[in-house]
Design a protein with these regions (language model features):
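An acidic/histidine-cluster motif and surrounding catalytic segment
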Residues: 2-116, 120-251
Length: 251
């Protein structure tokens, strides 16, 4: 009887966490092959957050240091403002990684996905908070940012204090109980964000027509601000781990 009870409990618990992520088709994380430490970190965070393993998908990041960019890829970067910078190829690899995940989302007809950098730290009870956000997404939303740093500038960043929940005053203006309109001075750094299918389609059309202008994060920010749909979760759901450094601006 004890064994049956225990098995039932485990099954119920797994079902509960599955239900909390029911609206999310996939949670992608971007990870360089040469950074197994970051891969281990991310999977450990997912384990602690009880994220169902079948929802998690690793996307092997395009390594700008070694990747051979095709002509049809290079044309997307003809107007970028970081041309000639020492980190140019690294940003290009990162930007295409996000871009190709959007393409996969559309090809697979996913309604909602989450894209994460591999250094994220999830808030306690992450799935409960995420479920509230998923049930509150505005009808015109294309991206909803859920991950933020307290401060970030190139390779230097400070993690958000995830023990607090009074985040709205730093982020922006209330839209509903779980979503806010972000201030245009906020940079989520493309750390962790929800994408809607409509958003992925619109972004791909935009990038195909105009290409990229800035690095991944600011390209998103400018696009969303222009359309007045710069959304974020009212409570920060995850932040970055400073001890893992930056794959783009680090050595």
């Amino acid at each position: 009887m004890i064994r049956k009870s225990k098995l039932y409990y485990i099954t119920f618990k797994d079902l509960y966490f599955k239900i909390l992520m029911d609206k999310v088709d996939k949670l992608y994380y971007i990870n360089l092959k040469r950074r197994p430490d970051r891969n281990d970190h991310f999977l450990n965070e997912c384990l602690k957050a009880n994220i169902p393993t079948h929802k998690i998908k690793r996307f092997e990041a395009l390594d700008g240091l070694t990747y051979n960019f095709e002509d049809d890829e290079l044309i997307l970067f003809k107007n970028v403002d970081y041309r000639g910078k020492s980190f140019e190829n690294k940003i290009m690899g990162n930007q295409l990684s996000h871009y190709y995940i959007l393409k996969e989302m559309v090809e697979k007809h996913y309604n909602y996905i989450i894209i994460c950098q591999d250094d994220v730290i999830f808030r306690d009870n992450f799935l409960t908070y995420l479920n509230r956000v998923m049930n509150s997404i505005p009808i015109d939303a294309e991206i909803v940012n859920i991950g933020f740093h307290e401060f970030a500038s190139y390779e230097h960043f400070v993690a958000w204090d995830l023990t607090k929940t009074n985040d709205l005053e730093k982020l922006g203006q209330k839209y509903n109980d779980n979503i806010c309109k972000l201030n245009n001075t906020v940079n989520p750094c493309s750390l962790a964000y929800i994408v809607t299918l409509k958003g992925a389609i619109n972004l791909l059309v935009f990038f195909k027509k105009y290409g990229f202008f800035r690095a991944t994060d600011w390209n998103y920010n400018d696009y969303l601000n222009y359309k007045n749909i710069f959304y974020g979760s009212s409570i920060v759901l995850c932040t970055g781990n400073p001890s893992l450094g930056s794959d783009i601006f680090g050595k």
